[in-house]
């Protein structure tokens, strides 16, 4: 659905506090590292709000707070995923531009074609937008399953009118294949498509040869190689390569493919060499080494008589989630131009040395294309502050342990905080033991723990002022963090965070001209202990807390944003505790501001319950029977039963998240 353009300066809700004289947006920039991971798309404006520049360096920005409040006025509840179509277009354009520059730099006598791996994010609006943006650059699609092949065939327009058969958009057919998959891929050639079937198991070759003869369609084939270079064996991506890789052919397997194609007079069908390092390769050295091996393999295949045309380097182009520009798993020690340069240079050198024609270059850089375009915005529902309440001194007749703890609390100073800290720990342990053996009441134990946490907070405030924090006290950073309860499900909206320890930039989208005085972890709506985020980006390490602002009792929401979540998160999300898909909105920039391209409403309770085979009418009827029985037994009044049934029926139509 489209809407009228909204001027960027007319959006609702400019509820800004005055700038804190002791804090600046430059300090927020340094703390949250927005420029390091977000440039050129995300920044902080003078009002202390996050801005989004969907066109990157070409200018024009939107105030994210104003956008969120305008969307909420349209009855779009949080959590809310905002997709910026122009960022998607810009990422694809940048990738093509980097390879064009590399090709010009090295005088490479061939071209580059991007291919989007549908598995990265299969959402229809995104795939259709990418195909539209990629028409001029012949961007193709990669399918790793039969359903993804269905998407590719129906979404990518058949290039019937294009003369150069080698620059048509490609459909790369990866993954496990049965005979139906292969038949569909082969028949797609009749539509004018250019499907390349990647042989990843030897049995697939026999099926392709048999089906292609039956259909009288000459196949276009590729082989996926298991690279075995030394650095891959010790790296985090080794599971996708080497002798024990899940998919791909060993060197003996590839030789067998060559011989079988020769025997069937089909060696000219082999067109592509493909390898895949992973979706997030942080170290450029791994890419360099893999390219050396793959380039030499390409040359050898040509020398064996294969009519090779493409080198598909797969995925691996990483996203710098923490902005550190290192080989840490959440970062990368290279940029997109370095990546393109190294790929072009490696195959150029190998082909010149081997005296073979250089191939068309192909990459499946899904994460790098998709990650930046989506921003997840959610609100904070409440907090739990550790050791925040002021303790009361124990009575004269109180247990001696309580008196000792209170003395410890009162005598904490910057000069002797270490001794008091260890005393407080010991007394807390003693309190637990005394309670377990019945020598301390529940009330007394509660008071003991309250004083203990007050001691810890007092000591924590002292250690925060130190240039060097002794090792014994470094754990206080984690122990003394508060909990902010947030309106989302980590399992649904950030599954890589809990399953793979993936880091995403998270920060307030407003109040960034004020000092964030609270250190917190985030707890989601689920009743699972894993439903939390307690790892946050930092320059040198992973932080165990996020700096945020105190919650105000002024009725205004406090918004947090999770950035770079456009790749994999939506499709990997699950229905833990039956929290369903969230509201999604697609935003495009206009000369006047922005326009809502489409809205995808999140799951209602009826829809989520249907996923687990519950019918809402049956549920409502079941509750009605229970209320009628309760009415007849005098357990509930008629008015109460009416209200219960009305609330139940209305709830079934509502969003699964809190309003």
Swiss-Prot record:
Transmembrane segments: none annotated. GO terms for molecular function: arginine decarboxylase activity; metal ion binding. It is an enzyme of class 4 (lyase). InterPro entries: Ala_racemase/Decarboxylase_C, Arg_decarb_HB, Arg_decarbox_C, Arg_decrbxlase, De-COase2_N, De-COase2_pyr-phos_BS, Orn/DAP/Arg_de-COase, PLP-binding_barrel. The modification N6-(pyridoxal phosphate)lysine is found at residue 119. It catalyses: L-arginine + H(+) = agmatine + CO2. SUPFAM superfamilies: Alanine racemase C-terminal domain-like, PLP-binding barrel. Its cofactor is Mg(2+); pyridoxal 5'-phosphate. Keywords: Decarboxylase, Lyase, Magnesium, Metal-binding, Polyamine biosynthesis, Pyridoxal phosphate, Spermidine biosynthesis. GO terms for biological process: arginine catabolic process; spermidine biosynthetic process. Substrate binds at residues 311-321. Pfam families: Arg_decarb_HB, Arg_decarbox_C, Orn_Arg_deC_N. Its EC number is 4.1.1.19. HAMAP family: SpeA. Belongs to the Orn/Lys/Arg decarboxylase class-II family. SpeA subfamily. NCBIfam families: PRK05354.1 (NF003763), speA (TIGR01273). Catalyzes the biosynthesis of agmatine from arginine. This is Biosynthetic arginine decarboxylase 2. It comes from Synechocystis sp. (strain ATCC 27184 / PCC 6803 / Kazusa).
């Amino acid at each position: 659905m489209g809407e009228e353009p909204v001027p960027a300066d007319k959006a609702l809700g400019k509820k800004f506090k005055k700038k804190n004289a002791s804090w600046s947006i430059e300090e927020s920039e340094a703390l949250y590292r927005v420029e390091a991971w977000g440039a050129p798309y995300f920044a902080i404006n003078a009002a202390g709000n996050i801005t989004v520049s969907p066109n990157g360096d070409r200018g024009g920005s939107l105030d994210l707070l104003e956008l969120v409040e305008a969307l909420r006025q349209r009855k779009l509840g949080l959590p809310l995923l905002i997709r910026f179509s122009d960022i998607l277009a810009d990422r694809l354009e940048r990738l093509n531009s980097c390879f064009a520059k590399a090709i010009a730099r090295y005088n490479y006598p061939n071209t580059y074609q991007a291919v989007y791996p549908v598995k990265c994010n299969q959402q229809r609006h995104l795939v259709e937008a990418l195909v539209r943006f990629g028409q001029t650059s012949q961007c193709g699609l990669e399918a790793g399953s039969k359903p993804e092949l269905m998407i590719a065939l129906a979404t990518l327009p058949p290039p019937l009118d294009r003369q150069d058969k080698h620059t048509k958009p490609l459909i790369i057919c990866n993954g496990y294949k049965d005979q139906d998959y292969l038949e569909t891929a082969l028949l797609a050639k009749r539509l004018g498509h250019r499907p390349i079937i990647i042989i990843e198991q030897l049995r697939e070759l026999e099926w392709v040869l048999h089906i292609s003869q039956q259909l009288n369609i000459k196949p276009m084939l590729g082989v996926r190689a298991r690279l075995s270079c030394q650095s891959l064996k010790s790296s985090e991506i080794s599971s996708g390569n080497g002798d024990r890789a899940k998919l791909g052919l060993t060197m003996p397997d590839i030789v067998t493919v060559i011989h079988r194609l020769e025997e069937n007079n089909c060696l000219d069908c082999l067109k592509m060499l493909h390898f895949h390092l992973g979706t997030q390769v942080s170290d450029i050295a791994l890419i360099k080494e893999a390219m050396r091996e793959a380039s030499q393999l390409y040359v050898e295949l040509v020398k064996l008589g294969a009519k090779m045309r493409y080198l598909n380097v797969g995925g691996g182009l990483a996203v710098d989630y923490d902005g550190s520009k290192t080989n840490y798993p959440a970062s990368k020690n290279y940029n997109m131009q370095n990546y393109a340069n190294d790929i072009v240079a490696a195959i150029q050198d190998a082909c010149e040395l081997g005296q073979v024609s250089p191939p068309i270059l192909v990459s499946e850089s899904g994460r790098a294309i998709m990650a930046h375009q989506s921003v997840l915005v959610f609100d904070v529902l409440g907090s739990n502050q550790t050791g925040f309440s002021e303790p009361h001194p124990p009575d004269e007749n109180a247990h001696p342990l309580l008196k000792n703890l209170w003395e410890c609390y009162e005598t904490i100073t910057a000069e002797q905080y270490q001794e008091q800290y260890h005393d407080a720990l010991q007394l807390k342990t003693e309190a637990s033991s005394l309670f377990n053996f019945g020598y301390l009441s529940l009330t007394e134990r509660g008071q003991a723990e309250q004083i203990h946490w007050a001691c810890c907070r007092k000591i924590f405030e002292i250690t925060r002022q130190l240039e060097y924090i002794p090792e014994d006290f470094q754990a206080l950073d984690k122990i003394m963090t508060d909990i902010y309860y947030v309106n989302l499900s980590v399992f649904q909206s950030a599954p890589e965070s809990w399953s793979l320890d993936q880091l995403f930039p998270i920060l307030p989208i407003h109040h960034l001209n004020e000092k964030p005085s609270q250190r917190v972890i985030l707890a989601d709506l689920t009743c699972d202990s894993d439903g939390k985020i307690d790892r946050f980006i930092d320059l040198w390490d992973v932080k165990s807390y996020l700096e945020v602002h105190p919650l105000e009792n002024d009725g205004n929401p406090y918004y947090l944003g999770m950035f770079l979540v456009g790749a994999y998160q939506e499709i990997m999300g699950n229905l833990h505790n039956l929290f369903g898909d969230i509201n999604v909105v697609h935003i495009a920039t206009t000369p006047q501001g922005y326009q809502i391209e489409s809205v995808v409403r999140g799951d209602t309770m009826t829809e989520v319950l249907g996923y687990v085979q519950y019918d809402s009418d049956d549920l409502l009827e079941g509750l009605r029977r229970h209320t009628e029985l309760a009415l007849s037994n005098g357990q509930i009044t008629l008015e109460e039963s009416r209200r219960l049934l009305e609330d139940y029926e209305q709830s079934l139509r509502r969003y699964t998240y809190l309003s």
